[in-house]
């Protein structure tokens, strides 16, 4: 959906859904306000006073944006990503920023590829940070060895958020 379409829908009042009488949690202003929320298709286009053909009365229930877990090791939960999602989404977390360092220690790049594949179709939005090297220190012994250059294959994936520059140890090679 294009931004111009959303702007037009908001301007013309083309709401596909209006959630009435909600206590809207504004995480930017640290306020809770009683308001209606206008939705066009699957995007919120306004908060204020709205009406529409398809209305839901929230009855004062709280309406908050999805929470973002800024750093998580999904594999440390000892469950697959879909099971992890079933536990966290009912509590409001809709996005996680995962560091697949644990699985990279064991399975290398194949483990990171597996994490991408296992999270491709989930309703949970999973973004990835990339470890700069595996193992984390030269004193560790794990199932795999990766340096920053090995991470290049993941750098341009749409869900890759962060790439750490090579460590001084890697630059000397």
Short names for language-model regions:
Residues 164-172:
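Conserved small/polar residues in nucleotide/adenosyl-binding loops
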Residues 18, 38, 67-69, 73, ...:
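Short, conserved beta-strand segments within well-ordered enzyme catalytic domains
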Residues 57, 69, 170:
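Acidic active-site catalytic centers that drive phospho-/nucleotidyl reactions
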Residues 27-30, 77, 142-144:
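Short loop/turn motifs at secondary-structure junctions and domain boundaries
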């Amino acid at each position: 959906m294009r931004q111009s379409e959303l702007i037009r829908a908001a301007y013309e009042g083309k709401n596909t859904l209006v959630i009435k009488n909600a206590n809207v949690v504004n995480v930017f202003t640290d306020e809770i306000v009683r308001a209606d929320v206008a939705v066009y298709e699957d995007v919120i286009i306004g908060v204020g006073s709205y009406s529409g053909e398809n209305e839901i009365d929230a009855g004062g229930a709280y309406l908050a944006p999805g929470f973002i877990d800024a750093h998580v090791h999904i594999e440390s939960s000892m469950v697959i990503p879909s099971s992890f999602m079933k536990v966290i989404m009912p509590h409001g977390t809709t996005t996680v920023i995962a560091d697949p360092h644990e699985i990279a220690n064991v399975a290398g790049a194949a483990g990171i590829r597996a994490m991408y594949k296992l999270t491709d179709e989930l309703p949970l939005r999973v973004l990835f940070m990339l470890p700069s090297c595996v193992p984390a220190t030269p004193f560790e012994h794990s199932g795999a060895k990766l340096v920053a250059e090995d991470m290049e294959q993941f750098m341009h994936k749409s869900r890759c958020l962060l790439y750490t520059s090579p460590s001084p140890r890697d630059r000397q090679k």
